[in-house]
Amino acid sequence: MSTTHETPEATAEGDKPCIAVVFGGRSSEHSISLITARSVLRAIDRDRWDVVSVGISTDGAWFLCSQEELEALLDDQPMAQLPVGVHRVSLPLQTGDSRLLIHDTSEHGAPLSRGRHIDAVFPLLHGPFGEDGTLQGMLELADLPYVGCGVAASAIGMDKHFMKLAFQAAGLEVGPYTVVHDRTWRTDPLGVREAVAELGFPVFVKPARAGSSFGITRVDEPSQLDAAIATAREHDLKLVVEAGIDGREIECAVLGGHGTDEARASLPGEIEVHGHALYDFEAKYVESDGATLSCPARLPEHVIDTLRRDAVRAFHAVDGEGLSRCDFFVTADERVLINEINTMPGFTPISMYPRMWAASGIDYSALIDELITLALERPVGLR
């Protein structure tokens, strides 16, 4: 698969487009974002792009954080949180002013030291306040191109309830589920228990708007339900309860198309989890042997074709741009059910999204180039 595209015209400040790699953030996935950013900063082509790296603390402060500082932090503490740096940054949020304003907040620093022209932003934040449309809306206000989905797609892709509605509207098959709103649980818990029982056990109780499998519990019998709901509510007061599906877990990666070209789907991969009841946080990010990926998945060719087609359909169902990862179940009778879409999938060395593209002919560095190029080609604003 060819991925060669011309580098956009360089800016006046340098001979290469300047990309702001942004990471950290206020969500529970802060540490995962740092691991993702370290991988991208190691692999990005410095001959093609100028790079400025920007951290966001858990309380929302933006500041310069060099690759060396990030590497040292993660070497010392693999699941670290960013300390606030002295060189704070901000965006002017003004059309035509594509600068990253850099403030020196050290004891004797000037109130404003300089501005840095930015051509595009590569947001590597996971979860709320990062991949849910909030950051994307701010970048739209700042008139800055950025990698990945826009405001609406990001918001839909963060909410397991609304993404399922979008899938169903597009004619994609989803498994049985029910939604538990905060008010409903507080005023009618018996009704919630009855609705869940109608799904049949086992079920999976999930926060509607959390990622990386935070707060997810498998429930095998009614007596376990209330505790699972309490666990999920620590992450989100809106929950989705899904019926357990007897099927294989298959993923497919999607890349947006250039211009009027169709979006592209990778070869699908199959996740095999080791030593865990489900594909949880530890299996995804901590244990290198927590899960294995077979890519391409060992499936009949017509099922692979269906998965790739449905991944692109799901991408368009949420108005996707740039990238996404779609998660499916394939049953013994070859039914394909879509479970979720992730508009900012994991991007670490053991993450499924880059591994599926590597198996499909696009290596990690080339994938980063492709995503940045797609961002620079795309206008901001209504499109």
UniProtKB/Swiss-Prot annotation:
Pathway: Cell wall biogenesis; peptidoglycan biosynthesis. Residues 164-373 form the ATP-grasp domain. Keywords: ATP-binding, Cell shape, Cell wall biogenesis/degradation, Cytoplasm, Ligase, Magnesium, Manganese, Metal-binding, Nucleotide-binding, Peptidoglycan synthesis. GO terms for molecular function: ATP binding; D-alanine-D-alanine ligase activity; metal ion binding. Its cofactor is Mg(2+); Mn(2+). Its main location: cytoplasm. It holds the Pfam family Dala_Dala_lig_C. It catalyses: 2 D-alanine + ATP = D-alanyl-D-alanine + ADP + phosphate + H(+). Its EC number is 6.3.2.4. One of its GO terms (biological process) is regulation of cell shape. Mg(2+) 1 binds at residues 327, 340. Mg(2+) 2 binds at residues 340, 342. Binds 2 magnesium or manganese ions per subunit. ATP binds at residues 196-251. GO terms for cellular component: cytosol. InterPro entries: ATP-grasp, ATP_grasp_subdomain_1, D-Ala_lig_Van_CS, D_ala_D_ala, Dala_Dala_lig_C, Dala_Dala_lig_N, PreATP-grasp_dom_sf. It is found in: Cytoplasm. HAMAP family: Dala_Dala_lig. Cell wall formation. Belongs to the D-alanine--D-alanine ligase family. This is D-alanine--D-alanine ligase. The lineage of its organism: Bacteria, Bacillati, Actinomycetota, Actinomycetes, Micrococcales.
